[in-house]
Regions:
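Flexible, solvent-exposed loop segments that connect beta-strands
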Residues: 57-67, 98-122, 154-174
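Repeated loop/turn-to-beta-strand initiation elements of outer-membrane beta-barrel proteins
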Residues: 23, 48-53, 85, 139-142
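Transmembrane beta-strands of outer-membrane beta-barrel pores
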Residues: 29-33, 55-61, 79, 94-100, ...
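Transmembrane beta-barrel domains of outer membrane proteins
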Residues: 42, 78-81, 131-133, 186-188
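Solvent-exposed loop/turn segments connecting transmembrane beta-strands
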Residues: 24-40, 58-69, 84
Length: 190
């Protein structure tokens, strides 16, 4: 009886290891360039399907006139057009964040009001993404991904970026447009 139990465990264990799925860890270089700590993990659960969970946090500010503190979490389902962790993928993602930003000029003229005021609040939304993995070798990849989606933003607007600035208004904003961008270095476990 004991021998059967041990053999059953060994067979089950070997069957699980044969069908073991790939897993990857990553870091978004765009988020890191902004001074944020970030990490992501992606798990393959089918021949063309993966689940990615990424997060980012920036708990400090740079100067008195510039505030850029936030945390963000983003789960995403990905469907790979060829094979997982190689080539093109389409994704559907959700995201949630809490922010305290102001005194910053955004690139490409986005959100020009952030230069003069400070905004604190939270957001939740989701969208669709497209990305591409470039294989460097067996373990290392580069990933580029962009997404378009909807964000519900609940905010408080302050007169200036100072922490003790006068509250001007409370409100919410519905945003539709680019809501995800990543350039990540990826390590794949086999």
């Amino acid at each position: 009886m004991k021998t059967r139990y041990v053999l059953s465990c060994l067979l089950l264990g070997s069957a699980l290891s044969v069908s073991a799925q790939k897993m990857a860890v990553k870091s978004n270089l765009l988020s890191a360039a902004n001074g944020a700590l970030n990490a992501g993990v992606e798990y393959a659960f089918g021949p063309k399907s993966t689940f990615d969970l990424s997060g980012s946090i920036r708990p400090w500010k740079r100067t008195e006139g510039y505030v850029n503190k936030y945390w963000l979490i983003q789960p995403e389902y990905r469907y790979w057009t060829c094979q997982k962790f190689n080539g093109s993928f389409w994704g559907a993602y959700l995201n949630g964040a809490q922010f305290n930003v102001g005194g910053k000029k955004m690139p490409f003229g986005l959100f020009p009001w952030l230069k003069e005021h400070r905004y604190a609040g939270w957001l939740a939304g989701g969208g669709i993404s497209y990305g591409y993995h470039i294989m460097l070798n067996r373990h290392w990849n580069i990933e580029v991904s962009v997404g378009v989606g909807y964000e519900y933003i609940d905010y408080k607007k302050y007169k200036c970026p100072d922490v003790c600035a006068e509250l001007l208004e409370k409100g919410h904003y519905r945003y539709f447009g680019p809501s995800k961008a990543s350039l990540s270095i990826v390590y794949i476990f086999n």
